[in-house]
Amino acid sequence: RGHWDRGFFMRNFTDITDQNFEAAALEMFRYQYANNQVYGKFCDLINRTPKAVKALKNIPFLPVELYKKHRVVTGAFTPETVFTSSATTGETPSNHWVKELAHYEQVYVKGFEREFGDLEDWTVLALLPSYLERSGSSLVAMAEGMIKRSGKKESGFYLYNHGALEKV
């Protein structure tokens, strides 16, 4: 299998348009197949190799169960953080291994701004009860990053402060 190319990943996740989405998705599929051992093996087992996948609708999704049992990553690295799912009692959470938080933030901010415009033009109000009460939530990390980037004094978490939320 191939070598991790961060530049490839960055180009394909920050420069995607409606016009090139399918081509970029197919290119990313081929890249993940070649460089992500868990995903590549899964695709082999279900006979969905790059030779067989020629359209977006045929790209296989990795079952969430594999994120619970395997380290699903592309390339070898020490993660800056590991986000975990909110598993119900007794369940094993799934893991999302993040190499660089700055890169992770760049991707979700660009995605937001592509759809809604400059984040600095928005006030971000976060009311995330079950997420704030546990550690490892990617949603909390995204909300926190967006709150900081918005720069608005009203932006923030309003978990138990409904009175202040009503005033915003």
Please place each PLM-identified region on the residue numbering.
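Glycine-biased, low-complexity coil/linker segments
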Residues: R1-G2
